[in-house]
Amino acid sequence: MILDTIEQVKIYLIQELLVRPEVSVHVEYLSGGVSCRVWKIVQNNHRWVIKQALEKLDVQADWFSDVERIHREHRVMKQIEFIVPDSNVPKVLHVDYTNHVYIMTCAEEGVETWKDLLMHGVFNVSTAKSAASILSQIHSQSYKIDEEQKIEFSDQNYFNQLRIDPFHRFLIQKYPELTANITKLIDELSLQRTCLVHGDFSPKNMLVQKNGEIVLIDFEVAHWGNPVFDLAYCLGHLMLKAWHLKKYEELLSLINTFLDSYKGMVLNLLPHLGLMLLARMDGKSPVNYIQDESLKQSIRMVAINWITNTSAEPNVLEAIEQQFQSISKV
């Protein structure tokens, strides 16, 4: 059963014996993602979120992924309970393997995504600190995960479908001169695997609560892999917000706090960060808020320069600051 409408969601809830037909239920579509249908359910004082995977993602290019990934997601969330505080990750309440659906707890009323806060000019360093702290815990404490689950999470099929293929391999088609460099980055992600990786560690997947703490969502790309991906992915989004908003000092402060609070060390971060920037310009899922062609070209130049970087491990914060200063003068 595909949950495309409010009425379909209500029928589904009744069929699954999750609500009684005579009881009023409020159903609201939650936007923001391209890979799933997500709905908020409110019944009396109870609030849940229902999520169903899409086979074809909602982007312009043809982009497909196995809907079984939704079950990887809720199993990862169950394991995360042993790593981070309960308040930082939703709890899984119901799983439906037939329709590729699961239901989880809903965040408190009034929360906003970190992305929305940034886009509205709210630059709170405590949010960056909270995000980095959660990521650090996931990376450093994931050795606690059940061994059988580690084996399952080592399968990178969904990661390939949702990240490597639409980002790295798609870029190779557009930039064949970067084939060797991008292939090296793919190899690092597939071979240097040391911990649980979120795979979609973006400000849009962080719900900021009233107390400033973050609720982390969207684990469908999670896998046992290289932690550099999560850092590059998040930093790329923060850099793009800086260029779009022209708030370089504010975003640099957030990036500095994020890197300082992470407290871990990853190798070869700058080339992976460059790849993320280029993917958000020319991959299968480019950001929709950067439209200025001259700015896009400047970002491409930064990205390619970093992807092809062969120098000793550079200071990432200094490299970001230099590019902010350079582009801010254009």
Region spans (language model):
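ATP/Mg2+ or Mg2+-diphosphate-binding catalytic cores
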Residues: 249, 280-330
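Juxta-kinase regulatory segment immediately upstream of eukaryotic protein kinase catalytic domains
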Residues: 1-27
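Active-site catalytic-loop/activation-segment of kinase and kinase-like phosphoryl-transfer enzymes
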Residues: 1-11, 102-105, 137-188
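Phosphate/pyrophosphate-binding loops and the adjoining catalytic core of nucleotide-dependent enzymes
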Residues: 3, 35, 266-273, 314, ...
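Active-site acidic catalytic loop and adjacent metal/ATP-binding pocket
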Residues: 28-43, 48-50, 184-229
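Short Pro/Gly-enriched beta-strand edge/turn motifs at strand-loop
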Residues: 17-25, 74, 162, 179-191
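Active-site activation/catalytic loop segments of kinase-like enzymes and analogous catalytic loops
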Residues: 75, 228-264, 274-292
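ATP-binding pocket architecture of kinase catalytic cores
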Residues: 30, 39-146
